[in-house]
Swiss-Prot record:
Catalyzes the conversion of acetate into acetyl-CoA (AcCoA), an essential intermediate at the junction of anabolic and catabolic pathways. AcsA undergoes a two-step reaction. In the first half reaction, AcsA combines acetate with ATP to form acetyl-adenylate (AcAMP) intermediate. In the second half reaction, it can then transfer the acetyl group from AcAMP to the sulfhydryl group of CoA, forming the product AcCoA. HAMAP family: Ac_CoA_synth. GO terms for biological process: acetyl-CoA biosynthetic process from acetate. The lineage of its organism: Bacteria, Pseudomonadati, Pseudomonadota, Gammaproteobacteria, Vibrionales. ATP binds at residues 387-389, 411-416, 500, 515, 526. The gene is acsA. It holds the Pfam family ACAS_N. This is Acetyl-coenzyme A synthetase. Acetylated. Deacetylation by the SIR2-homolog deacetylase activates the enzyme.
Length: 649
């Protein structure tokens, strides 16, 4: 491996940071030797209605997997994110909304946020929503998305947010699985100057015969665009809140009461409803936000993630607001209307902490200094990366160009399932290596195991697992605990399997090497290959399909589809477009294949299993050593695929 450049800890940052290297090591040791004592102390980072006496009650044992933290305590998330700040910072901005159009913005103080959340909480109650009911959000990136989330938590409803880029079919599937009672949406969203037909998509989803649980749809007027109206079902947000009281007492919730369901892509078809509960999740999101971003009084924090992803939950809304921070919520994209938009927003709002994705960084990097044209970015103090491993070249560009070589970069590794950041540098404590997520956060116990599950010590490469629980860990898959155990705990007994590969270097730093299961990472969004394959095979002209990921300069991975057509069907430019449009409709634009490879046959073992390893190598042009092909039923298929590869559209 080439020489790795090490960036020492920035001493100016270290002087005021919450922890230095020595303190990190000491706290980390405490957290793994005595997790009970450590989390008893740090569980106090949030306000409890009824204090907990029990801290950790967890098991990774096969057949008995159970995760419970602070299980006899009670609290309310909304009260922790808003009410507890009113006496000390009521007039401080809580949310700064920056519209898609650079002239569009709005600020909500903690007092104003409190009023809006209480009103919308009462509006939800007036539409029949009660504690424990599931509410589905399909929203644009507007402040009302955060208000709706906080209102759900205030009254004890469970929210499930579906990213606004998902299709009506994908939305319907998630509504059915979660048994949601009400949908919150907008007439339209706005993204890069284009309208997104959210209400129409909801109407289409609810027309699906399998969707039977939805009673009401609350619609926010974002653009004023024309929408179909179902008067017995649809309610305008502004009308529902106009008559609502601005007082709403927060519901007392048990630490293990469900907080939200968030669907993530599985390697076996149907998306999985990851369940996070109230106490452990909030403690972990609050604590990681404070330490990972070294949050200090007066910081303005901007996370560019959509609320529809876990990063938007933990580090756009809950983590920042629980810490009393000012969080920027951005409707647009980092390169619209110009390549320098991200830098312009930093200057406009004096952003001091920026958290974005390698995809955005690579897209801006391709434009060189255009990304910083006419901006100073002098307010920046800390920068972060999330969503996928960042390649060293992009890390260096982000550091030198966006951050003027001044700002530490926290390259964070975590998942929807983990609730919060697991492996990360801390700004005042960790020397940085571009491309490495570095060291585990407090209480996090990673290990690297070989394919037999043997723990590898020292410098090693293999499968990344966690050997013990942490408060932010998911509790189960909604309605399917068996699948939860099967997915995460059956591969390596007694350990949580992340699905990622990693290597550990001589300094104990972790480097994430990518997925080892059949899940793609497209622009930081996880997509199951099986979900895309299922959509393709549902197309009436396709007999069989296999999906692999190939490297992509901007998106990290592109989608490469091998397709076998039904007898009598002939590949054509028209069919090529039909297939892409079909996947876009079934799942959403993000799942659209970048490459279609028409073929008569796929490489299969004698037992009928598709050999994806070989398909990956062919797709990436790495055909020099295909490894063991002795189990192939028909080895000639491989040569044919290699020849066909030359003509891929």
């Amino acid at each position: 491996m080439s020489e790795v450049h090490v960036y020492p800890v920035n001493q100016e940052i270290a002087a005021t940071a919450h922890v230095n290297d020595e303190q990190y090591r000491e706290m980390y040791q405490q957290s793994v030797i005595n997790p009970e004592g450590f989390w008893r102390e740090h569980g106090q980072i949030v306000d409890w209605i009824k204090p907990f006496t029990k801290v950790k009650h967890t098991s990774f044992d096969t057949g008995h997997v159970s995760v419970k933290w602070f299980e006899d305590g009670t609290l309310n998330v909304s009260a922790n994110c808003i009410d507890r700040h009113l006496a000390t910072r009521g007039d401080q901005p809580a949310i700064i909304w920056e519209g898609d159009d650079p002239t569009d913005d709005a600020t909500f103080t903690y007092n104003e946020l409190h009023e809006q959340v209480c009103k919308f909480s009462n509006a939800l109650k007036s539409q029949g929503v009660r504690k424990g009911d599931v509410v589905c959000l399909y929203m644009p990136m507007v402040a009302e998305a955060a208000i709706a989330m906080l209102a759900c938590t205030r009254i004890g409803a469970v929210h499930t947010i579906v990213f606004g880029g998902f299709s009506p079919e994908a939305l319907a599937g998630r509504i059915v699985d979660s048994n949601a009672k009400l949908v919150i949406t907008a007439d339209e969203g706005v993204r890069a100057g284009r309208a997104v037909p959210l209400k129409k998509n909801v109407d289409d989803a609810l027309a699906n015969k399998n969707v039977t649980s939805i009673e009401k749809v609350i619609v926010l007027k974002r653009t004023g665009g024309n929408v179909e109206w179902h008067s017995e079902r649809d309610v305008w947000w502004h009308e529902a809140t106009a008559v609502a009281s601005s007082h709403c007492e927060p519901e007392e919730m048990n630490a293990e009461d469900p907080l939200f369901i968030l669907y993530t892509s599985g390697s076996t078809g149907k998306p999985k409803g990851v369940l996070h509960t109230t106490g452990g999740y909030l403690v972990y999101a609050t604590m990681t936000f404070k330490y990972v971003f070294d949050y200090q009084e007066g910081d303005v924090y901007w996370c560019t993630a959509d609320v529809g992803w876990i990063t938007g939950h933990s580090y756009l809304v809950y983590g920042p607001l629980a810490n009393g921070a000012t969080t920027v919520l951005f409707e647009g994209v980092p390169n619209y209307p110009s390549t320098s938009r991200m830098s312009e927003v930093v200057d406009k709002h004096n952003v001091s902490i920026l958290y974005t994705a390698p995809t955005a960084i690579r897209a801006l990097m391709a434009k060189g200094t255009e990304a910083i044209k006419g901006t100073s970015r002098s307010s920046l103090r800390i920068m972060g990366s999330v969503g996928e491993p960042i390649n060293p070249e992009a890390w260096e560009w982000y550091h030198h160009t966006i951050g003027d070589s001044r700002c530490p970069i926290v390259d964070t590794w975590w998942q929807t399932e983990t609730g919060g950041i697991l492996i990360t540098p801390l700004p005042g404590a960790t020397a940085l290596k571009p491309g490495s997520a570095t060291r585990p956060f407090f209480g996090v116990q990673p290990a690297i195991v070989d394919n037999m599950g043997n723990i590898l010590e020292g410098v090693a490469e293999g499968n990344l697992v966690m050997v013990d629980s942490w408060p932010g860990q998911m509790r189960t898959l909604w309605g399917d605990h068996e699948r939860f155990e099967q997915t995460y705990f059956s591969t390596f007994q007694g350990m949580y399997f992340t699905g990622d590969g990693a290597r550990r270097d001589e300094d104990g730093y972790y480097w994430i090497t990518g997925r080892v299961d059949d899940v793609l990472n497209i622009s930081g969004h996880r997509m199951g290959t099986a979900e895309i394959e299922s959509a393709l095979v549902a197309f009436d002209k396709i007999a069989e399909a296999a999906i692999v990921g190939v490297p992509h300069d901007i998106k990290g991975q592109a989608i490469y589809a091998y397709i076998t057509l039904n007898d009598g069907e002939i590949p054509s430019a028209e069919l090529h477009k039909e297939v892409k449009d079909w996947v876009r409709k079934e799942i959403g634009p993000i799942a659209t294949p970048d490459f279609l490879h028409w073929t008569d046959a796929l490489p299969k073992t004698r037992s009928g299993k598709i050999m994806r390893r070989i398909l990956r190598k062919i797709a990436t042009g790495d055909t020099g050593s295909l490894g063991d092909t002795s189990t192939l039923a028909d080895p000639s298929v491989v040569d044919k695929l290699i020849a066909e590869k030359q003509t891929i559209l």
